[in-house]
């Protein structure tokens, strides 16, 4: 999430394949068909935490919904030249038809904080796994002492996307992608309620990062203006799992206007025929979608993915149900089904999302570069060679074309 959709030209792919075939080199294609990481099965890259989109399309020869692409035919034509004598490639099966679904409203709403399960009591902060939960979101709640001054709240290692509320009012959103962990607390009365809602976004699944606990994995502290640090204790912890039974079992109420805090939204649409479709999520902020009880996957407004693939076999003639857990509130609680996906619409606002906080700017005034050059266009390793030994602090790359 928050990065450009991965693509590669058919020309480059076929060129690389031909070179290996001509040299009798074994290889595999990553991906021939990427498919979809349904539900919460999307992982994350390492070492810098980079959660993977629900779509695993990867601009592959066979696209997310199983349809062949122009790139597929280029690969097929190439491979046909390397078949043993007398063999031929099999026929291409027919594609599953796609359908459009007219815009429909999700005007039944259940506010998350009004539909919490029974809490678990814990003196100290612990990770999500300590409360027998592996995916989804988790809510940590405690009360704070009185303070006449502002204080700094520090949440150490919130994995992966946290919202902080004080007496029901949202104070901040903290993203692991941006390395955020501090919030300024306003003056408050004794017993003010602190809520920290943390969403797990996908585990790093290789290398040292494979030990990727979720929730708040270390500690929560407040620091006064005179530097006194207090570790917060006595937590009520609410599991918010991702199973459909939990999402469905809510007290939904009619609500036409969008809310700006976490809530479940429910709506239905009618079909005369079924087929694959792509739910357009551009009205929604961040969350999870279920269709007819199936966990379709995560969405996030920052993109680049703006649609969710729904296989036609999970739809039915007649009434179909959609439930959405939206963590920050939609622009409008409505959606539609498209016949083509939107996988390359990056909507990151402001400065570089993953690497720069608000107010942080790189000032190179007066600095002289020790070397300036360009890379040639194309794939493969390229090297930078300095004419002499140099001392450097920054290595900057600028995209000259795309």
Question: Residue ranges of each PLM-predicted region?
Answer:
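Aromatic, loop-rich ligand-recognition surfaces of beta-strand-rich domains
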Residues: 296, 351-365, 376-402
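The substrate-binding groove and active-site-proximal loops of carbohydrate-active enzymes
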Residues: 1-12, 16, 57-70, 304
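Short strand-edge motifs at loop-to-beta-strand transitions and within beta-strands
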Residues: 140-142, 179-183, 265-267, 304-308, ...
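C-terminal functional regions that serve as terminal interaction/effector modules
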Residues: 200-201, 208-209, 285-290, 294-300, ...
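Noncatalytic modules at the cell exterior or secretory-pathway interfaces
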Residues: 186-198, 313-326, 388-401
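Aromatic-lined ligand-binding clefts that engage carbohydrates, nucleic acids, or primary amines
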Residues: 150-165, 269-292, 299-300, 322-324
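Residue-level detector of high-confidence beta-strand sites
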Residues: 173, 298, 372-374
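Carbohydrate-binding surfaces of carbohydrate-active enzymes
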Residues: 21-254, 327-330, 394
């Amino acid at each position: 999430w928050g990065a450009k959709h991965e693509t590669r030209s058919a020309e480059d792919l076929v060129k690389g394949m031909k070179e290996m075939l001509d040299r009798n080199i074994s290889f595999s294609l990553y991906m021939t068909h990427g498919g979809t990481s349904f539900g919460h099965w999307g992982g994350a890259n390492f070492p810098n935490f980079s959660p993977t989109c629900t779509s695993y399309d990867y601009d592959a020869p066979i696209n997310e919904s199983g349809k062949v692409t122009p790139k597929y035919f280029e690969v097929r034509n190439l491979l046909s030249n390397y078949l043993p004598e007398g063999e031929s490639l099999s026929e291409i099966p027919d594609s599953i038809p796609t359908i459009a679904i007219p815009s429909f409203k999700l005007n039944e709403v259940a506010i998350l904080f009004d539909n919490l399960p029974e809490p678990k009591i814990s003196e100290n902060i612990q990770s999500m796994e300590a409360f027998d939960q592996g995916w989804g979101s988790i809510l940590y709640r405690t009360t704070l002492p009185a303070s006449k001054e502002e204080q700094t709240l520090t949440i150490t290692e919130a994995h992966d996307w946290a919202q902080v509320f004080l007496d029901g009012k949202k104070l901040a959103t903290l993203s692991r992608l941006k390395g955020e962990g501090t919030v300024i607390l306003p003056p408050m009365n004794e017993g003010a309620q602190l809520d920290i809602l943390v969403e797990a976004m996908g585990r790093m699944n290789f290398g040292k990062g494979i030990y990727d606990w979720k929730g708040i994995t270390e500690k929560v502290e407040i620091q006064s203006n005179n530097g006194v640090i207090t570790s917060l204790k006595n937590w009520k912890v609410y599991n918010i799992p991702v199973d459909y039974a939990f999402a469905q079992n809510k007290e939904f109420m009619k609500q036409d206007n969008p809310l700006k805090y976490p809530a479940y939204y429910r709506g239905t649409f009618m079909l005369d025929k079924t087929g694959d479709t792509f739910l357009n999520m551009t009205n929604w902020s961040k969350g999870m979608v279920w269709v007819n009880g199936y966990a379709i996957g995560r969405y996030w407004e920052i993109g680049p993915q703006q649609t969710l693939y729904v296989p036609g076999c999970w739809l039915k003639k007649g009434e179909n149900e959609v439930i959405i857990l939206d963590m920050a509130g939609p622009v409008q609680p409505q959606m539609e089904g498209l016949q083509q996906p939107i996988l390359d619409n990056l909507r990151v606002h402001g400065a570089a999302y993953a690497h720069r906080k608000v107010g942080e700017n790189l000032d190179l005034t007066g600095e002289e570069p020790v070397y300036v050059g360009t890379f040639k266009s194309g794939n493969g390793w390229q090297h930078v060679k300095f004419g002499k030994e140099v001392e450097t602090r920054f290595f900057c790359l600028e995209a000259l074309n795309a």
